[in-house]
Amino acid sequence: MNFETIIGLEVHVELNTNSKIFSPSSAHFGQEANANTNVIDWSFPGVLPVINKGVIDAGIKAALALNMDIHKKMHFDRKNYFYPDNPKAYQISQFDEPIGFNGWIDITLEDGTSKKIRIERAHLEEDAGKNTHGTDGYSYVDLNRQGVPLIEIVSEADMRSPEEAYAYLTALKEIIQYTGISDVKMEEGSMRVDANISLRPYGQKEFGTKTELKNLNSFSNVRKGLEFEVERQAKVLRSGGVIRQETRRYDEASKGTILMRVKEGAADYRYFPEPDLPLYEIDDVWIEEMRHELPQFPAQRRATYINDLGLSSYDANQLTATKAMSDFFEKAVALGGDAKQVSNWLQGEVAQYLNAEGKAIQEISLTPANLVEMIGIIADGTISSKIAKKVFVHLAKNGGSAREYVEKAGLVQISDPDVLIPIIHRVFEEQEAAVVDFKSGKRNADKAFTGFLMKATKGQANPQVAQQLLAQELQKLLD
């Protein structure tokens, strides 16, 4: 029997506001334990939450970016549960009226086909703290994360393969990152994914019993965990077994999923409206203000790069992977840079440098104007492509004018025959053995002189001019 895979994803995105959702404490990552807390985060008696307007702004932007309807009368609810990292014994979230609902995004699969994935809802809530279990037998609570604003984005169960789930997460991350509401860094916990997966026989309308997957700390692990579950559940069903409603975690060591707990039924969180927060009215003026702040998104940019600038689909995808890189590219082209040349540099030397340094493009000193100027002096013969790599590293570290640096550092390409011919003759004198090989007709002996000449000029000889002059002077040796 063959089975159809049914997948839905729940994605928590940490919003990059300066302060928390209901308290003035800093929301920044990486501080000493409990440094970013106050009496609201610790839930002291009598303290009251105050909404951070920037969180609602971010929620509106997310809803618009995900093609969602917006609840114009929005409220918060209490989700009741007890856990040590939750001192109030409830979480302030949204239940029946989330800020966004009925959305969708398009995804592109590896074969180039596209599919629309519906999004059920996007709701605002506060994050919980973090428990740490020490080797001394004690457990410790860090409330730095308590109250950090989140938006949870819940898809419909529209994905039919792990590949589609991976494509959905990739597209969702791009869109959220472009809005500027989050840096969506999974390694820092600002994007977290839970997956729900079930199988059903083809043709059956009812969903099968779902399994929830946790501990998915990368898109790759989401895909691997789902692929494992497809095989595991199919094997159970084909052998006549029954799938239990479980929560499982992905284990990187075994490349499989491990049972965490069996769910007997849906949890009852006893939601009710948060009495300490008012109803918030989101009018059309507010919505349009947020819409005006949104950028052009990756799909539209890719279409422009392909249709108007003549780039390949691959190049367009690479350039739009982050908003910072896409913005850099567009500014460089607007300054007169050739789109293909700019693209080649950004995907080549620039990308290699950023990876080696562990930095984003906005964190180095290279500017679009610097890059365009450097490409220009390559084109006019001032420097060679080889020297340009050295110039680029200088610009990445120090900025400034490419032409001024080249002139100051003595890196201008040598194209004058009156300068190059004497150097060629000196090379002949120094490389007597190579000259003998050449005269005797030894195969490829002439090619060695190119390397000798480039070494003698410290790489500054114009390659095209050098080749012509070398051929000319070598021929004279045979005459």
UniProtKB/Swiss-Prot annotation:
Keywords carried by this UniProt record: ATP-binding, Ligase, Nucleotide-binding, Protein biosynthesis
GO biological process, one term: translation
InterPro entries named in the record: Asn/Gln-tRNA_amidoTrfase_suB/E, Asn/Gln-tRNA_Trfase_suB/E_cat, Asn/Gln_amidotransferase, Asn/Gln_tRNA_amidoTrase-B-like, GatB, GatB_C_1, GatB_Yqey_C_2, Gln-tRNA_amidoTrfase_suB_CS
Catalysed reaction equations from the record: L-glutamyl-tRNA(Gln) + L-glutamine + ATP + H2O = L-glutaminyl-tRNA(Gln) + L-glutamate + ADP + phosphate + H(+); L-aspartyl-tRNA(Asn) + L-glutamine + ATP + H2O = L-asparaginyl-tRNA(Asn) + L-glutamate + ADP + phosphate + 2 H(+)
Record's function text: Allows the formation of correctly charged Asn-tRNA(Asn) or Gln-tRNA(Gln) through the transamidation of misacylated Asp-tRNA(Asn) or Glu-tRNA(Gln) in organisms which lack either or both of asparaginyl-tRNA or glutaminyl-tRNA synthetases. The reaction takes place in the presence of glutamine and ATP through an activated phospho-Asp-tRNA(Asn) or phospho-Glu-tRNA(Gln).
Family to which the UniProt record says this protein belongs: Belongs to the GatB/GatE family. GatB subfamily.
Stated name of the protein: Aspartyl/glutamyl-tRNA(Asn/Gln) amidotransferase subunit B
Native source species: Streptococcus uberis (strain ATCC BAA-854 / 0140J)
Gene field: gatB
